A protein has these predicted regions:
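Non-catalytic accessory segments flanking enzyme active sites
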Residues: 21-65, 69-70
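A residue-level signal for conserved active-site and pocket-lining positions in enzyme catalytic cores
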Residues: 35, 141, 195
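Rieske [2Fe-2S] iron-sulfur-binding domain
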Residues: 52-154, 160-169
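C-terminal catalytic domain of Rieske-type non-heme iron oxygenases
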Residues: 72, 147-251
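Short, contiguous pre-domain boundary segments
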Residues: 8-23, 176
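Short, Lys/Arg-enriched N-terminal segments with co-localized hydrophobic residues
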Residues: 1-2
Length: 251
């Protein structure tokens, strides 16, 4: 029997404060499917930086759940996000993880698509074939400070609502003028929440990242002992953070 949203809410409400999540959140297949449906298929997701595709026709693939998304720059320098699925028989359109294409050509039956997703050619179709109805399915895409975000939902949450809590923090760094100097992929053999848990706590920072700790105030590290706001110095740290936020709004 598959777990539904109501059962998931019950499990969440039974969670003890300041404790790790129940084991089911990390190993249950149904919960993972709900994660994909309720979070990754509805929320804005960062996929890369514009400097990764600087030229006309440059593209890369981004995998999200079971979906493969083509991120590509067209001749007018607009960036598009298309599902990597031919509308004819569902074949993958792009087989390489990255590259440069001036035209998408399906390797199965040679349907071809322009970079904006419209059909260029569909061989031997009937006279009543309407190419406008068979363009590549696209998803929402937004560029903010050089960062590319996509949203798979048909009714996405407003991008401004999504980005506003971090807007000032991101704008300070001038990422729109940045370029990627190096890329590295670190596959994680585990649930995505494990990686997020590791990022959100700094209890491990002392033994695991001594150089990082050497350039931060000790109380900053302590305040993130088991996650944001859980350490004994969190009140003092939060005051400092709030003061900084006030200053950031004035910039």
């Amino acid at each position: 029997i598959k777990m539904n949203n109501k059962e998931l809410q019950t499990l969440i409400k039974s969670q003890k404060a300041n404790h790790t999540l129940d084991q089911k959140f990390y190993i249950d297949d149904d919960i993972f499917e709900l994660d994909l449906k309720n979070i990754f298929s509805k929320q804005w997701v960062f996929v890369g930086h514009i400097s990764r595709i600087p030229n006309f026709g440059d593209y890369f693939l981004f995998e999200i759940g079971k979906e493969s998304i083509i991120i590509i720059r067209d001749k007018k320098s607009n960036i598009h996000a298309h599902y990597n699925v031919c509308r004819h028989r569902g074949s993958r359109v792009c087989l390489e993880q990255q590259g440069n294409n001036k035209l998408f050509v399906c390797p199965y039956h040679a349907w071809s698509y322009n970079l904006d997703g419209s059909i260029k050619s569909a061989r031997l179709m009937n006279d009543d074939f309407n190419p406008d109805e068979w363009r590549l399915n696209s998803c929402n895409v937004k560029i903010f400070e050089g960062l590319i975000y996509i949203n798979l939902s048909d009714n996405p949450v407003g991008f401004e609502d999504f980005i506003s809590p971090t807007r000032k923090f991101i704008e300070l760094h001038g990422l729109g003028d940045a370029k990627i100097a190096h890329r590295a992929i670190y596959p994680t053999n585990g649930n995505w929440k494990l990686t997020l848990d590791n990022f959100h706590e700094c209890y491990h920072c002392g033994p695991a990242h001594p150089e990082y700790c050497s350039v931060h105030d000790k109380e900053y590290i302590i305040a993130y002992g088991a996650g944001g706001g859980t350490g004994p110095a969190s009140d003092k740290f939060n005051k400092i953070l709030n003061d900084w936020n006030v200053k950031a709004k004035k910039l």
